[in-house]
Amino acid sequence: MTSNYFEYNKAKVIQALRYHFISRKEIKIMIVLINVFAILSATLFFFKKISPLAFLLSSFLWFVMMILFWFLLPRIIYKKSSSFKDRFKINLNDATFSLEHERASRSFNWTEFDSWMESPHFFHLYFNATSFFLIPKDAFENEGEQEARNYFKEKIKK
């Protein structure tokens, strides 16, 4: 199965990178801990057990973390990666996943992938926790998206 040539849409890529960051286990744990800390400090501030400064610091920490993971990190990654500005074509078959660029191509065995995830506009194919491909769903025509999903389910064990 072969996709059309595709280009990345900046807004959709940034949204996909947000999904990537928020789906990481360590970031989920950090978000939960900071939210618990913020709720605890708000409660203690309400009952006048802590000073306003402690409450402001916990609120500031929460805002910084949300701005970092929701706005800054996705944009930084997008700007640093030149591949989001190129055109690609993929080919899926029983043995390999092939990525074709206008100047070169590369094939990967399915066993090289660690896991995969689906977000609203992309399939995320992971080599490890930090290295992955974003494959736009709109690169496939008609039933191609479902075919690709079936390949990923069959070939990449989550």
Where are these regions (language model features)?
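Juxtamembrane "helix-exit" motif on the non-cytosolic side of transmembrane helices
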Residues: 41-50
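Generic beta-strand structural signal
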Residues: 91-92, 118, 127
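Phosphoinositide-dependent membrane-docking surfaces
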Residues: 97, 106-123
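Alpha-helical transmembrane spans of integral membrane proteins, capturing the lipid-embedded, hydrophobic core
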Residues: 34-38, 59-63, 67
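A membrane-cytosol interface segment of integral membrane proteins
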Residues: 124-158
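Conserved beta-hairpin
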Residues: 67-107
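N-terminal membrane-targeting/pre-transmembrane regions
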Residues: 1-40
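Hydrophobic alpha-helical transmembrane segments
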Residues: 49-62
